[in-house]
Amino acid sequence: MELRKDKLLMFYSEGKESKEAKWAVNDPMSKSYKLSLPSALRPDNLLPGNRLRYTDASKSKSSKVSWYKTILDPGSEIVLKWNWVFIVSCMVALFIDPLYFFVPAIGGDKNYPCARTDTSLSILVTFFRTIADLFYLLHIFIKFRTGFIAPNSSTRVFGRGELVMDPKAIAWRYIKSDFIIDLIATLPLPQIVIWFVISTTKSYRFDHNNNAIALIVLLQYIPRFYLIIPLSSQIVKATGVVTKTAWAGAAYNLLLYMLASHVLGAAWYILSVDRYTSCWKSRCNGEAGQVNCQLYYLDCDSMYDNNQMTWANVTKVFKLCDARNGEFKYGIFGNAITKNVVSSQFFERYFYCLWWGLQQLSSYGQNLSTTMFMGETTFAVLIAIFGLVLFAHLIGNMQTYLQSLTVRLEEWRLKKRDTEEWMRHRQLPEELRNRVRRYEQYKWLATRGVDEEVLLQSLPTDLRRDIQRHLCLDLVRRVPFFSQMDDQLLDAICERLVSSLCTEGTYLVREGDLISEMLFIIRGRLESSTTNGGRTGFFNSIILRPGDFCGEELLSWALLPKSTLNLPSSTRTVRALVEVEAFALRAEDLKFVANQFRRLHSKKLQHTFRFYSHHWRTWAACFIQAAWRRYKRRVMENNLTAIESMENEEGEVGEELVVVEEEECVEESPRTKMNLGVMVLASRFAANTRRGVAAQRVKDVELPRFKKPEEPDFSAEHDD
Amino acid sequence: MNKIRSLRCLLPETITSASTAASNRGSDGSQFSVLWRHQILDPDSNIVTYWNHVFLITSILALFLDPFYFYVPYVGGPACLSIDISLAATVTFFRTVADIFHLLHIFMKFRTAFVARSSRVFGRGELVMDSREIAMRYLKTDFLIDVAAMLPLPQLVIWLVIPAATNGTANHANSTLALIVLVQYIPRSFIIFPLNQRIIKTTGFIAKTAWAGAAYNLLLYILASHVLGAMWYLSSIGRQFSCWSNVCKKDNALRVLDCLPSFLDCKSLEQPERQYWQNVTQVLSHCDATSSTTNFKFGMFAEAFTTQVATTDFVSKYLYCLWWGLRNLSSYGQNITTSVYLGETLFCITICIFGLILFTLLIGNMQSSLQSMSVRVEEWRVKRRDTEEWMRHRQLPPELQERVRRFVQYKWLATRGVDEESILHSLPTDLRREIQRHLCLSLVRRVPFFSQMDDQLLDAICGCLVSSLSTAGTYIFREGDPVNEMLFVIRGQIESSTTNGGRSGFFNSTTLRPGDFCGEELLTWALMPNSTLNLPSSTRSVRALSEVEAFALSAEDLKFVAHQFKRLQSKKLQHAFRYYSHQWRAWGACFVQSAWRRYKRRKLAKELSLHESSGYYYPDETGYNEEDEETREYYYGSDEEGGSMDNTNLGATILASKFAANTRRGTNQKASSSSTGKKDGSSTSLKMPQLFKPDEPDFSIDKEDV
């Protein structure tokens, strides 16, 4: 291990010369390490060694060696893609192999059938199988170049574990574990047997070789099928699932079912041909007459000489082996012979056998009527067992995928039914029930049954903040109150904003209730009204639109230096006119932000708050109305004073009024210190409220006093 | 659209205090909404959801209707095909009605808004209401499939087939019609999947009840059987016709007979050339599916002719084909005996695959639906089994086990397994308050202590009240335990008793009925100016006599309400609290009894002093001293009480007189018991144990300000 660590350290220290270092790391480092030379001499040895070898080796060799010696990470993207490609090629190879069973066929005519070989089919299947074998070979090569996790308990206790990158250790581990199975699966056995068969022409060898092909393909099928199981588990271990969507999983299971039908049909076909030809052979060997029967007479490639033609005229082999009238019992293989499946074209043969396999597999072989032949009975037992296993597997997997598709919908349906049952149990009035149903419907449309809070809580802090910034920041900047803040303050506020959904007709807050959150409207409209504490004759109503906020009493409360627990009471009643989507900032979150970020205490925010606060606008409107009425009263009294100049008592009353006006002017004097920005905002405000003021009717009755709203304490010194 | 919206955000809102301006704007909005409602529809509104359901039903009916075109050809005579014109006309009529629904669907898609993708970041998203954008988006996505499904192709072929039948190409026309219906079946089936998705997206489910979902899946299964049976029938007719065609070509090749293609059409039955050909030819014997000597292999299609399906009337034919499809679909085609013909084999493979898929889907969906029906009952059953197993594991005594079972049964009756808190918590604040007001307010007003509060205070208290269930025999509080909640009795009876701190010889017991409350020490604690964390200790033991349903107000909620609402601190509430508090009543009863005993003792001493001479002067002086001490001790309390009583108004006097009337019976009983005790030992009665005056909650506002 120490030697490996030293090599790794040398490898990483010389990053730029990685190729040369890899080339040189074997010979001089190991030698120098064994000789235990002092460290000062190592660079002197390395430099001339590198130069000498660099001059000797060509560029192509160095690039090939570097590619050849690359060690792959088993969790990396390229290995995962290769696993996918390899599992697909394994499935295709499993599909190609049973096509070898269709190579033997029955030729000739009805009177004189003979056994033949479909040479074009064998060549085609061999070609495709060779391509599939190349994938297996490439798989072995990649396994020799893929690292593995060290099995020591100390490395896997925490995290993912350490990778072993030594080629020798990788090769040794692979040879000890999976190499034998991979080698058996890779061997091109059917190709060798096929090319050996083509060279021979004798019939008895032909029959023997047919059985040899079937046996070899079946034997090699087992390791090839076995390869898929650890490959699937590797994919599951790396990514969590084999298929990304549920429908792909269902299609994958159906494909396995079709593959089993394909193998079963092909096996049935070759067993039928074998039964047919074995009948011929037994009758041919047992036939004793004028002309002896040779086995090559049954081959379609025979010479057709005089002896064979004489034998064909007198023989009774084909009559005895007739599937309809003969003595031989074919059992479940009789259909293949009576319906001329074994003597049809390839596509007819293939699709009929696929249909036969599918039929028997899905009905667990209950249509089969067998003879006492042991091979046939064993085959039927295998069909029944595989049918049961595959059918149950198919239904179970389909059901699992269906449930995963509809689990969210079922949860929603259950919740809706629970709510309906609970409302009926508690005998809520119909109006309340309709409101609850409308809110549930709206919540489904907005969230589709997914709990956003739970999803966000399971992510790390940085991701959560980035996601909430993506969700909130563009919308929050639309609110003018937030546009004055900097990014850090906005990030802190975005983390604490909660989306709030209100259906039509909902009272968000009533006058006199406690305010527990501040709402910033994103979509929809709200009606905000006040009676100034229930005073008769006073009513003010405005429409809040996207970009406005309500619950601004909470900001005054949050900026108070004394942290009292009492929440402020609302001075307005807020009701949703249409469906409203808003961001809510809760009381404790607002107090936390106000305490943490001193930048919230600034005059700029104070002026923006005054400008956009409807509370302040209402007060300003009342103030202007009171000033106007005072002006009109003063003008009228001046006229009256001018008309009636002789009464002294009225003059005294006028003096008192003048004194009151002077006091109010004194109160207004601190406002003259505001800067130019405030004056611009004030003039804009005055221009916008001109229409509202003009619409007011002149009332001689004294207007009830509207209290000035409590101003939030934006000063930073007071907190200190 | 975005520019207009941004401009609106920049402009500050004007204060609309004028009523005329508000009325004008309201009327203008209503007119605009009427115009808007007629033009562009909201995809989540009720009218679009209703239309989606209607269109889904009509689409399924159209899928059911199209395979009837396959039954139009039939065997009308020996070796000839004919066309059922009445059936074709009927199916064409109904299909035209279905096509009108498809046309209306296309029109609705041009008038339905969609949610802009960029606005889906928050909430439900914003709707795009521009007609041009809606049309452009629809043309780019689903328009081609909708048009392909809407085209009246079979109608055109039918009207072309009828005049072309005179040419003798009946089979060719039939094949064309079948091919067109099959090709159009694909987009028509494809329409249902996004329609299902849209309905689920809007409402959350396809069917409201589980049984409707199961019936829907079964209906799809029967629809597949119907299509499969129709295809089998048409393929059988095709195989029969191909056999006739082969024999006809063979006759022409042998030059024995002249066989025209029109001979295979039933319209040529009366022609003499056709009759001569029919008598001489061997087509009937060669193409007879019922005969075993025929050379042509009908395979699975022979059944259509052995059972006379192809020549019988429509209703019998249709029902047999439906049965054939249902049988082979549900058994994955295992009863089919096929020939080696390639088309037949492919058809059987398709039957088997569709059978597997539909059977698996049916079982899976049925199980999901059935599971959702009984999920609450199963949860409750599992919970009860867990409870029983846990009680057995912990070896609880049988009496405790019985109490647990009784409580679990009672809780099921009260809630039916539904978690009320989670349902309420998922609703917004206003709805939650309305529901809790509906649930609590009429019951809370029955408690006299709450009737003194105003609506706003009651709303806040209703928001904090939690329902509490106790079975008979349960001790809610024990004397000396900390009080963590205040109970207001709604149903049932509670026994409240005290031994005044475990003092021997003292016992007071009352029965609390609906409208009473217990745990009133908590109110004293909540109104203290200094917020201490220690909960008060209970001075009484409270036990449930029957099953009790009450509202509980927890300690932190009570402190929150007391701090938030200054109106809780008022003299009116103080008097109501004293009047209805059983603790104060007990103290009042003890005070009255002590006063009475003091009066009787003073009277007896006075009488004795009159009759006795100067020889007994020393013992009289001792008794007088004791009496004086007791009088001084109670006089102190009496002074304080008297001082506060002087300040009360007329309402307090009325309450006091009502209080005196209610406690008259209790006083009489206590007097009789005290007289009995006096007879036993006068020394014990002389040393009467003193009940401490209960702590009074601080209702004054001035101290709070300090």
From Swiss-Prot, chain A:
<feature type="transmembrane region" description="Helical; Name=H3">
    <location>
        <begin position="179"/>
        <end position="199"/>
    </location>
</feature>
<keyword id="KW-0112">Calmodulin-binding</keyword>
<dbReference type="GO" id="GO:0005516">
    <property type="term" value="F:calmodulin binding"/>
</dbReference>
<dbReference type="GO" id="GO:0030552">
    <property type="term" value="F:cAMP binding"/>
</dbReference>
<feature type="domain" description="IQ">
    <location>
        <begin position="617"/>
        <end position="646"/>
    </location>
</feature>
<feature type="transmembrane region" description="Helical; Name=H4">
    <location>
        <begin position="212"/>
        <end position="232"/>
    </location>
</feature>
<feature type="transmembrane region" description="Helical; Name=H1">
    <location>
        <begin position="86"/>
        <end position="106"/>
    </location>
</feature>
<dbReference type="Pfam" id="PF00027">
    <property type="entry name" value="cNMP_binding"/>
</dbReference>
<dbReference type="InterPro" id="IPR018490">
    <property type="entry name" value="cNMP-bd_dom_sf"/>
</dbReference>
<feature type="region of interest" description="Calmodulin-binding">
    <location>
        <begin position="597"/>
        <end position="612"/>
    </location>
</feature>
<dbReference type="InterPro" id="IPR005821">
    <property type="entry name" value="Ion_trans_dom"/>
</dbReference>
<feature type="topological domain" description="Cytoplasmic">
    <location>
        <begin position="143"/>
        <end position="178"/>
    </location>
</feature>
<feature type="topological domain" description="Cytoplasmic">
    <location>
        <begin position="399"/>
        <end position="720"/>
    </location>
</feature>
<keyword id="KW-1133">Transmembrane helix</keyword>
<protein>
    <recommendedName>
        <fullName>Cyclic nucleotide-gated ion channel 17</fullName>
    </recommendedName>
</protein>
<feature type="binding site">
    <location>
        <position position="552"/>
    </location>
    <ligand>
        <name>a nucleoside 3',5'-cyclic phosphate</name>
    </ligand>
</feature>
<comment type="subunit">
    <text>Homotetramer or heterotetramer. Part of a functional complex containing PSKR1, BAK1, CNGC17, and AHA. Interacts with AHA1, AHA2, and BAK1, but not with PSKR1 or BRI1.</text>
</comment>
<keyword id="KW-0114">cAMP</keyword>
<keyword id="KW-0813">Transport</keyword>
<dbReference type="GO" id="GO:0005249">
    <property type="term" value="F:voltage-gated potassium channel activity"/>
</dbReference>
<keyword id="KW-0140">cGMP</keyword>
<keyword id="KW-1003">Cell membrane</keyword>
From Swiss-Prot, chain B:
<feature type="topological domain" description="Extracellular">
    <location>
        <begin position="239"/>
        <end position="345"/>
    </location>
</feature>
<dbReference type="GO" id="GO:0030553">
    <property type="term" value="F:cGMP binding"/>
</dbReference>
<dbReference type="GO" id="GO:0005262">
    <property type="term" value="F:calcium channel activity"/>
</dbReference>
<feature type="region of interest" description="Calmodulin-binding">
    <location>
        <begin position="565"/>
        <end position="580"/>
    </location>
</feature>
<keyword id="KW-0968">Cytoplasmic vesicle</keyword>
<feature type="transmembrane region" description="Helical; Name=H2">
    <location>
        <begin position="87"/>
        <end position="107"/>
    </location>
</feature>
<feature type="transmembrane region" description="Helical; Name=H5">
    <location>
        <begin position="218"/>
        <end position="238"/>
    </location>
</feature>
<keyword id="KW-0142">cGMP-binding</keyword>
<dbReference type="GO" id="GO:0009860">
    <property type="term" value="P:pollen tube growth"/>
</dbReference>
<comment type="function">
    <text>Cyclic nucleotide-gated ion channel required for directional pollen tube growth into the transmitting tract. Acts as a Ca(2+)-permeable divalent cation-selective channel inhibited by either lanthanum or gadolinium. Regulated by CPK32 to mediate Ca(2+) transport across the plasma membrane in response to Ca(2+) oscillation.</text>
</comment>
<keyword id="KW-0812">Transmembrane</keyword>
<keyword id="KW-0406">Ion transport</keyword>
<feature type="region of interest" description="Disordered">
    <location>
        <begin position="661"/>
        <end position="706"/>
    </location>
</feature>
<dbReference type="InterPro" id="IPR014710">
    <property type="entry name" value="RmlC-like_jellyroll"/>
</dbReference>
<dbReference type="GO" id="GO:0006874">
    <property type="term" value="P:intracellular calcium ion homeostasis"/>
</dbReference>
<dbReference type="InterPro" id="IPR000595">
    <property type="entry name" value="cNMP-bd_dom"/>
</dbReference>
<keyword id="KW-0547">Nucleotide-binding</keyword>
<dbReference type="Pfam" id="PF00027">
    <property type="entry name" value="cNMP_binding"/>
</dbReference>
<comment type="subunit">
    <text>Homomultimer. Interacts with CPK32.</text>
</comment>
<keyword id="KW-1071">Ligand-gated ion channel</keyword>
<feature type="topological domain" description="Cytoplasmic">
    <location>
        <begin position="367"/>
        <end position="706"/>
    </location>
</feature>
<feature type="topological domain" description="Extracellular">
    <location>
        <begin position="164"/>
        <end position="174"/>
    </location>
</feature>
